[in-house]
Every structure is written in C-alpha cells, then in structure tokens.
Amino acid sequence: MAENPENENNYSASNIQVLEGLEAVRKRPAMYIGDISEKGLHHLINETVDNSIDEAMAGYCQNIEVTINEDNSITVEDDGRGIPVDMHEKLHKSALEVVMTVLHAGGKFDKGSYKVSGGLHGVGVSCVNALSTHMKSQVFRDGKIYQQEYEKGKPLYPVKVVGETDKTGTRQQFWPDPEIFTTTVYQWAIVARRMRELAYLNAGIKITLSDLRPDPETGKTRTEVFHAKDGLKEFVRYVDRHRQHLFDDVIYLKTEKQNIPIEVAVMYNTDYTENIHSYVNNINTIEGGTHLQGFRAALTRTLKTYADNDPQISKQLEKAKIEITGEDFREVLTAVISIKVAEPQFEGQTKTKLGNSEVSGAVQQAVGEALTDYLEEHPNEAKMICNKVILAATARVAARKARESVQRKNVMSGGGLPGKLADCSNKDPKDCEIFLVEGDSAGGSAKQGRDRYTQAILPLRGKILNVEKVQRHRVFEAESVMNIIQSIGVRFGVEGEGDFEANTDKLRYDKIIIMTDADVDGSHIDTLIMTLFYRYMPKVIEQGHLYIATPPLYKCTYKKVSEYCYTEQQRQAFIDKYANGVEDAKAIHTQRYKGLGEMNPEQLWETTMDPKTRLLKQVTIENAADADEIFSMLMGDDVEPRREFIEKNATYANIDA
C-alpha cells in the first residue's frame, strides 16, 4: 500500500482546483471518453473507479466495490476519506457539487492531495455525471452521510445530510444515458478484465465486482473478488500462466529513481514472442513510450555485457557466427512494467504512449541494477537465458531469410500477387477492402457475389498456421501467411525499421475483413488469424484496418416474411413475433447456415458483404490481446486449463483436448 503522510491528510475543499466547465461534454462526448459505443460506456466505470484508486494510491483506501445493478446502472463504493463536502472558497458551493459538476475539478490537480493519479485525461467523475440520465453521489465523512443527485449533470438539490455513519468513503451510482451511447448494456468480461488489472497493479487493494443481473440460463448472479497481495509478481504469473517457463523465478524489482516509483516483474518462457505490458499511473500504455525504451535498453545492455564476459557463451556465439540484437533478448520473456509519474506527458489523446524524457534513464538504471544482481546471484538461470537468446538469434536469422524470400515475391518489390487473389479493379486503397475467406467453396461464392470494383477476395485453403507454437522463420515460410502478406501489401525490413517490424505505408486495402463460418471452427480460425496480426502485424490493428465479418446463423421465414438472424436471440424474437413464441415447423421455416458455402452468392452479398446491410466487428488491440491469450491457452502446453476452458465454452472451442 502507498504511504499515508501526515501533511497530506488534510483533504478539504481548498484542495479542489477548477480548470473549466462541463458544457461541452454532452455535445461532444467522444472528445472526452474516446467514443460512444461499448468502449466509451465501459470507460464510465473506469473513470469512477479511478477516483477510488487515487485514494488507494495515496494510502487511504483498501476496499472498492463495483456493482452492475439489474437495471444496468453502476454503483462504485470505496472506503477512502470521502470527497470533501465543505464550501469551496471561489465557487461558494459544496466541494462535492464542484467535483460532480465541473470538468477538470478535483484533488488530482492539487499536488498536496495526490502525488500521482490516473483517470482519462483527468476529466473526472463529472464527465460520468454529464453522460448519465441520473446520478446519485453519497459521501461518508465526519460521522455523516452526505448526498446529492443529478440529472444529465445538473444537481437536483444542494448537498444535504441524509443520515449518520461510522464509516468513511464515497458511493457513486449512475445510469448511462441511452441518448448518448449506442448501447447501455455492460459486459462482465470487460469490467472484470480492468478490475483484475487494477488489483494486480495496486498490491493489497481488494476490489469486489458483483453482477446483480440474473444469468439468462442459470438465473444466478455473480461476484468475484480481485486481490493480489504480491501485485506485479502475481500479474506476470497470470499473464504467463499458459506458457512453459524456462525456470520458475520471477525477476522482480520495486524501487524509486529520480522520484519515480518503478516496479517491474519478468518471467522467461520457451516461446519466441516478446510479451511486455506497460503501465503509467495504472493506465495501460499500449503504444509504450519512454519507460519501455528504458526497460529495453537496460535488458539489452545488461544481458549483452553478461554474455560477453562469460567465456562459454562467447565461444558459443563465435561458433554460431551470430551477432545478438536487442530483440533476441526480448523475444524470450514476459514482463509487466508499472511506474508512477507526477506529471505524465502522454502523446496523443488516448494516453497510450508516455513522452516524459526523464523516465527512460530512471527505468534503465533501476532495471540494469536489478538484472545485474540477479544474473550474478543466479548463474544457472543466467546461462539458461543466454542459451535461449542464442536460439532466438538463430531463429531470427532463419526468419529473415524466409522473410526476404516472401519480400522478393511481394507486389511492392515488383513481384506478382498470389494466384488465388481475386483483386478489385479500384486501385485507391482508401476505397478498397479484402475478404480473407475460409475455404475455396465459400471463396467462390464470395468472388461471384462481391462488388468487383472495391472488394477483393483471398480464399484461405488448408490449415491456418498456429503462430503461437512455431519459430518465426516457420511463420514466413507458411503459404497461408505468405499469401496474406503479399495480398495486403504489408512490408517487413523496410530501411530504418526493425527486421520484423510490419510497415503499412503501402497497405493495399483500408479494410481487411476475416470472413469465416458462423460456427466453432469459424471462431477458431478467426482467433488464429487475429493472433497472426496481433503478433506480427499489430500496426494493422492499431490503425483500425482489421475487421471480422458476421454471417447469419439462420434464415427464418413466416409466410412471405423472411429475416436473417445473426444471434439465437434474434431467431427467438422472430418466433415470438410471428408464432407467439412457439417453434412450430409448419408455421415457421428455419434454415440453419452451418457454413458460408451453404449460401449462394446473392445471399452472401446481402447478409455479409454489402456495406449497407452487413455487420462488421472491428478488431482492437484489446480484443486481439484476448484472442492471443485464449490461443496461448488453447494451443499451449498446459492441458488442464485448456480442458477446463473447453468444458465451460463448448460453443466456442471445438478443439481436441
């Protein structure tokens, strides 16, 4: 837990600083929460919980309860000090009302209240209030319960005392505005992922997540408690749980350099993929930044120095005629980096890349010292790491040769496109899209049904490579991978970039759409292809080019009325509407589509390919990471969690266990 310094305990209205008003939030919500779809909706929870986490980081809060209520409202309660309720000097209002109704108002802007804090651009809980039809704020402080309610950000009455209490803390309940958001239904998995993450990043804090909406099948509600006594040590084990470890130790450090608290946990495994998660003030810095640069520099320098000074390892390198690079040292590990910065400078509006220059040196020094000590104290593990690094370097050289072979054939290098590709006639990438279609028969229907001017088709024949289980050179030798790379125009080894950094400057299509059967095998192939892009071409995902098509599961017909149903719920709604909920084969004809090949070209166009009517799911780094994690488990070496997952998710994973 964080320190609880005496001089910071006087948390009152004088600590609440006001930077600007709330007016623009409802007019342009996406500017403040990213978007108004599912992601933005869930950010309302994150923003509210961040206030509680700030209290925890300052040393005043140990328990946070997050509840998804039956009506899809959210309640967040903590046992911190409670938002101040005394009068604000400048605004002559209760500090609680200021925090709840003024953008950029809060203790996080006053250094005496919080040394560091998270929160989306610091917009605070007032942003949540502005985007909710109704919100109720209760503060437990000084033996009293203070309360104020709001509609669309406006107070319904002044802050008032509604009871007495012997506890301290804050309880917030809000109802997201359906006029603002495209959906107001919260997803357990998304909320749970973030709560789990926060518990790992803040050792000792207990976060209880409850969902009071009865499960449609069992009728039960659910609760899960997230509590990590060992913080990042547990986090890195959790992230790496489906991989085979090189040795069981977690290399761990927790220190402070240049007034920057730094915490790092590292595990080595038998994979050939770099897996680094970095955080600043609890914010996932997906694009990395100066803290990641410092970590990588320390890793390369320290391990290279160790290898150069070890006669046995030096001899191995000389014999293999290989020069080790920084990426060889990183390919064999999973790491979690968490730092706290008082005034973080984030590049871009999404807080995904740290720009503070002073951080790099601090992290480099901390990691260099800790890793040097570990290697000296653990010579056997050090040799295991270096031997694995040599294997990674050997695989890298083989992969470069394989990649250069692909590059020679690549259209951007003057070669031809794959013979299976049915390209579109439009040559402006902004207007073009390519469908990666499972199987030749479906590929044939797609070729006939498409808009030939803007839509290209690449049938994927045979087995899609499981990139999680093979060395890198095998990936670049695989025909299915080669066909995708050639077709979409991704290039590797561009001058000035890393050997295996995917360059998308000459991407041939704006949308790359994975189109597979609407069954478990199709989901399996979706996951394989998503993992390929996540591991080897992440820029395609980051830039918003990767999508998944949604073919229908059923065609339901009642007399002359026909509807395509994409979910079981839509099919049931059709039955409810036309047959009073009774599935009568005489009244309603249901055609089940087991595969894309069962639809004729017109049906495939109408249901899955027509931009005016189709449903596309955009792949983000977050859901690609989920796919990667699922695949690490399904195709990993540990049988038991795989069996358990398949038993729980039989509709998703049709794989031999």
PLM region spans:
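GHKL-family ATPase ATP-binding module
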Residues: M1-N15, L22, L44-N46, D54-A56, ...
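Helical (often loop-to-helix) elements that flank the catalytic cores of nucleotide-handling enzymes
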Residues: E89, E347-S360, Y564-Q570, F574-Y578
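Short adenine-binding "F-helix/F-box" segment of the Bergerat
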Residues: H88-E89, L96
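Conserved short strand/loop->alpha-helix "switch" segment adjacent to the catalytic nucleotide/phosphoryl-transfer site
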Residues: K27-I45
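C-terminal interaction appendages of subunits in large macromolecular complexes
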Residues: T394-S413, D428-E433, G444, Q448-R450, ...
